Amino acid sequence: MSDADPSLQRIISVELDEGSIVWRNPDVEQERRVAIFDLIEENRFVPQRGHPDGYAGPYRLKLRVEDGRLIFEIAREDGSPLEAVILGLGRFRRPIRDYFAICDSYYQAIKTSTAQQIETVDMARRALHNEAAEMLMDRLDGKIAVDFDTARRLFTLICVLHIKG
């Protein structure tokens, strides 16, 4: 894949499986919109499996959760299926739960806390997000190469797929 044009090694479209999203609220919708916008604007996404026709991007991505697994459905620019990458979600359960808890604290702090308290909670939130992004990069190793910012945005979207009312 190293011979491929780097400008093609990217996601051009992201879709979340609507059946996987069980609950919505305005904060979650805003997080989803921002993550998708930022992801489309700037990302590095390189599936590691070679394809017989040499296809090397750009990619359309659909994320869904099924039977405790995260599924990355990867398609060509024209929408034709390319491959699916499946990850078990067991190792992500705690980071997702912790991230939700710190986000709740952050949203509460915004309403009632001092700037210094908000900054402290925000730093903790960012640290958890960074750790989860690194974990995602490790889990994708050998399957899909992504940069750190892409992994952070993908983790945000994975969280959106796990929100319960």
Curated annotation (Swiss-Prot):
Pfam families recorded: UPF0262
Entries under InterPro entries matching the protein: UCP032146
UniProt record similarity statement: Belongs to the UPF0262 family.
Protein name as catalogued: UPF0262 protein Sala_0765
